[in-house]
From Swiss-Prot:
Residues 393-406 have a biased composition (Low complexity). Keywords: DNA-binding, Metal-binding, Nucleus, Repeat, Transcription, Transcription regulation, Zinc, Zinc-finger. N-terminal zinc-fingers recognize and bind to the consensus Ikaros target site (5'-GGGA-3'), found in the promoter regions of immunologically relevant genes. C-terminal zinc fingers mediate homodimerization and heterodimerization. Belongs to the Ikaros C2H2-type zinc-finger protein family. One of its GO terms (cellular component) is nucleus. Transmembrane segments: none annotated. Residues 262-296, 309-440 are annotated as: Disordered. The keyword Nucleus applies. This is Ikaros family zinc finger protein. It comes from Myxine glutinosa (Atlantic hagfish).
């Protein structure tokens, strides 16, 4: 390619175009080439007198000066819009000429396409406050738009021209029914008009979603709309409130037997533990809004109510002097029954709060059955040696009459003053003081107590980490190094100090 020399030392092409000697860029004239070379040299000859900003072109400086004077010379003749740049005004005028017939009546935003309006209404807070669907049908999606929309169209349509019609295929079912006969409308499905606006727009939005919108968004929003009727505050709900939120089938199995316990009147239990387990599992699977530990709420109350059923209905005397048992007939022990229920339910029957009835003896609580994941879990105050001594020396006190059937001997239960207690006997988890923890706003906070150490946790994760420190066979055995503490104080000191025994690798 032959290049000629232009005046001023510029290299000119045969087509009378100039080229940059640094990067080879082709320019149509000397002024364009001069401005381009300033990008290589860094020269900015035009500088603002007020803020010191410099520019390569004078037009950029003049546009910048308007920022200081707040001057907006370009104004729209159809509305009050004003701007500093001509290209911005031209883009604004296109919104009037092209038109946005789909307008949201809750925030006055307009869109050119119906799908854009539906996508906006998924985020519009005013739309989700819930107005009647008839109001939306008559206003938001009327044939020619709302009155405000028609007034907007009158500025831009030509004389004698009809306003643009909305696509009939995009109308909602409610809009189609507006022209039906009233007698036919009464024969339609009663719940048709009561369909939520969110469901309608979500279905339509799924069919006309943009390719850039993830498909996963729809499933999450649908799930939130379907669970809108479930109101549950897990942080502030007490035991009684959580039990009242259990649906009817499970409430019938839990609250009816419990009522007989508080009224001290015998009531036969007609539902087995297997039915209670089945209903509880069905509740956990069908009600995702309920807490994940609903089984720990229902099962202790059910086991306690069956426990008291044998206390009232069986020939066993509940007097404080002792147990009178008919010879030749075996009666199941309440403690053993409660333990079997806890095993059947797949979760130990632990007490949630203080659910012991007022007329129940102090030594007998909702957690008198073997609980926790530790089979030998006993009182937190007793030492390991004392517990082993009780297990070896309580054989005479736990001997049963000859009339009893050959049930396996339970060394962890013993008879003491007419009551069946745990071996450690002295104190139970129900004898621990009950604390009500409140936040700064006065609302009750949910706590997670450790019945071994007497600690309260506000976070379930910290509670789980702490319970993992207790051993499986002995709660005061360190689950990290196997060190066996004498009491809870030594165990807490061992965990806090981190003085773990070296493990053989």
């Amino acid at each position: 390619m032959i290049q000629g020399s232009a005046p001023g030392g510029l290299s000119r092409l045969p087509s009378n175009k100039l080229t940059c000697e640094i990067c080879g860029m082709v320019c149509i004239g000397p002024n364009v080439l001069m401005v381009h070379k300033r990008s290589h040299t860094g020269e900015r000859p035009f500088q603002c007198n007020q803020c010191g900003a410099s520019f390569t072109q004078k037009g950029n400086l003049l546009r910048h000066v308007k920022l200081h004077t707040d001057e907006k010379p370009f104004k729209c003749s159809l509305c009050s819009y004003a701007c500093r740049r001509r290209d911005a005004l031209m883009g604004h005028i296109r919104t009037h000429s092209v038109g946005k017939p789909y307008k949201c009546n809750f925030c006055s935003r307009s869109y050119k396409q119906r799908s854009s309006l539906e996508e906006h209404q998924e985020r519009c807070p005013g739309f989700h406050q819930g107005l009647p669907s008839s109001h939306l049908a008559e206003n938001a999606f009327s044939k020619y738009g709302t009155t405000t929309e028609r007034a907007d169209w009158e500025h831009v349509i030509r004389p004698g021209q009809e306003p643009p019609l909305l696509d009939d295929s995009a109308l909602l079912p409610t809009d189609v029914r507006l022209g039906l006969d009233p007698a036919i409308e009464t024969q339609l499905e009663p719940g048709f008009d009561k369909l939520s606006n969110q469901d309608r727009f979500s279905n339509n939005f799924q069919a006309k979603r943009k390719s850039s919108t993830p498909q996963k968004v729809f499933g999450q929003k649908r799930m939130q709309l379907e669970l809108s009727d479930i109101h549950y505050d897990q942080a502030t709900s007490s035991l009684s409130e959580r039990l009242h939120e259990v649906p009817g089938p499970v409430c019938a199995q839990t609250l009816e037997p419990s009522a007989s316990v508080f009224l001290n009147t015998p009531s036969p239990v007609t539902r087995s533990a297997g039915q209670a387990l089945e209903a509880t599992r069905r509740l956990e699977s069908e009600s995702p809004g309920l807490p994940s530990d609903i089984g720990s709420i229902v099962r202790p109350v059910y086991s306690q109510s069956v426990d008291n059923r044998f206390q009232h209905d069986s020939p066993l005397s509940t007097s404080r002097s002792g147990l009178s048992q008919q010879p030749g007939r075996h009666h199941p022990s309440p403690g053993i029954l409660g333990g079997s229920l806890g095993g059947i339910c797949g979760r130990p029957a632990e007490a949630v709060g203080d659910s012991r009835p007022v007329n129940m003896p102090p030594g007998r609580g909702a957690t008198s059955s073997p609980s926790n994941s530790c089979p030998d879990s006993t009182d937190t105050e007793s030492s390991h040696e004392e517990r082993s001594h009780h297990r070896t020396g309580s054989g005479s006190s736990t001997s049963r009459p000859n009339g009893s059937t050959g049930r396996p001997h339970r060394p962890e239960m013993h008879q003491d003053n007419g009551r069946l207690n745990r071996v450690s006997g002295a104190s139970d988890s129900s004898s621990l003081p009950t604390y009500n923890v409140s936040g700064s706003d006065g609302e009750a906070l949910r706590t997670y107590p450790c019945h071994h150490c007497g600690l309260l946790f506000l976070d379930h994760v910290m509670y789980t980490l702490h319970m993992g420190c207790h051993g499986f066979r002995d709660p005061f055995e360190c689950n990290v190094c196997g060190y066996r503490s004498r009491d809870r104080y030594e165990f807490s000191s061992h965990i806090i100090r981190g003085e773990h025994l070296p493990t053989a690798e």
